[in-house]
Amino acid sequence: MFACAKIEDFAKWKSIYDEDVKLRDDAGMKERYIFTCTEDPKHIALLFAIDSIEKAKAFLESPEIRERMKKATIVGDPEIRFFHKVHETCCHEPC
């Protein structure tokens, strides 16, 4: 799952985000990467491995998480996309 969002304050967002690791674990969401945009560090992207699209959607739509997103300075709704892995390359060779 990819999530992209605009935030007002990275340090505040990261602090609140880090508090929610157990909630994400319980929803079957394992963080793989956090990115910031080179042109604007207030745009972030996250990559997660997920156990279930349904569980991830339920987590993201929960009132508690929606409120935490606001508290974490996320502007508007994050853009969420679900993808199926079709190929993986490690060191330029298939894994």
Model-derived features: positions:
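Glycine-rich beta-strand-turn "strand-cap" elements at beta-sheet edges
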Residues: 27-43, 68-95
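Short, well-ordered beta-strand segments in beta-rich or mixed alpha/beta enzyme
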Residues: 1-6, 33-62
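Residue-level signal for secondary-structure boundary sites
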Residues: 11-13, 54-56, 88
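A short local structural element in Rossmann-fold oxidoreductases
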Residues: 14, 57-60, 70
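Short amphipathic alpha-helical segments
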Residues: 9-32, 64-67
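A generic short-segment signal for beta-strand/edge and adjacent turn/coil regions
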Residues: 1-3, 12-19, 47-52, 93-94
